[in-house]
Amino acid sequence: KQVSEIIKICYDNDQEVIIHGGLTNLVGSTKSHSNQVVLSLEKMNNIIEVDEISKTITCESGVILEDLINASKDKELLLPLNFGARGSAQIGGAVSTNAGGLRVFKYGMTRNLVMGIEAVLPDGTIISSLKKLMKDNSGYDLKQFFIGSEGTLGVVTKLVLRLYPLPKTRYTSLAVTNDYQKVLDLSLIHI
């Protein structure tokens, strides 16, 4: 609600807003100027629920990715989103950039993990599709507009993410070949 109030005040006063997450993105999209309001989401760091039945985790957008990974692991579940900046990157930023990560070939991009979103539109309106449903054909899939939008359409404030059973075993392999296509073929066989 506070994000909504701040965004509405800025909208009413034609004030530019830059959203800050973990500041791990290196493309300069969070660079701010003296005439802009910087809205940090770092205190929106609550994990609301890890649901073992629906295999989902519901959280605020400022939660550090590694905290989500660990909370899932405590319930013997896997949040497959995992990349180098996991100890400081916030989940809202990962969603806003549609981050890939180390397990993208098996589990897909962040887009494939997001089941529901709550977001604040530029005029301060809160929209919510915080659903845990795997199959939902109840109209437009609003969350898809926000995933990868880099905050241009609104501020993501809460999320429902899909989890997987924690793998019982882990295999590592090394393949050396002169042909990149052979590497791809091998990796797809074992994923």
What are these model-derived regions, one by one?
Residues K1-M44, C59, L79:
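Glycine-rich N-terminal segment of FAD-binding domains in flavoprotein oxidoreductases
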